[in-house]
Amino acid sequence: GLCLNEIETAICTLDQRMGSIPFGFNLIHNLNEPELEAQTVQLYLRHKIRLISASAFMDLTLPLVYFRVKGIHRDPEGNIICPNKIIAKVSRVEVAKKFLSPPPEKLLGQLVEKKMITQEETNLARYLPMAEDLTAEADSGGHTDNRPALSLLPTMLALRDKLNEKYGYQRSICIGLGGGIATPESAAAAFSMGAAYVLSGS
């Protein structure tokens, strides 16, 4: 991965070149350097990066919840506005469930105690999932859990529907598919199974 200075340089370059075109950055969970993850989130918030792709997370972390919750408010019509969006990339159902659920109360409480978020942000966060959208990562060219797309995507879609009904979110979470999407035929197969989008990397 890039160091913080390199990330900041990339942010400034894209800000100048992209204008009003939206873009996002990656956030990879770093088990060995948790402070680097926190510093990266602070950097993103300072530069008003509103979209991140969260990958390699096995559990939700304080910096990740902080990014999602910071700045939540209601508009004049009473709608909940969440400026910071997370697209989670996961291959395990138990991890997907965490991202498709509201932020954990324990982590929200810690953020309030540290005065990193307000009580109002905490209250509104309970009505939103951690992830705006979620990519089901099947067997891919890089780091992988060797999950078969044919069973992984339908499982994630069913889980999304179950949690949407449980929590009554104001918008449905989009579920995409990544891993092995290398030809037009494989992309078409993903869409025919119900994927909202496809992700093609390596």
Feature annotation, model-predicted:
Residues 196-202:
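C-terminal, active-site-flanking charged/polar segments
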Residues 172-173, 194:
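Exposed boundary/loop context
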Residues 184-194:
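C-terminal or late-domain output modules
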Residues 1-172, 185:
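Active-site entrance/lid segments in N-terminal catalytic domains of soluble metabolic enzymes
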Residues 25, 190, 201:
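Conserved, mostly hydrophobic/aromatic
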Residues 174-182:
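Glycine-rich beta-strand-to-loop/alpha-helix junction loops that act as flexible
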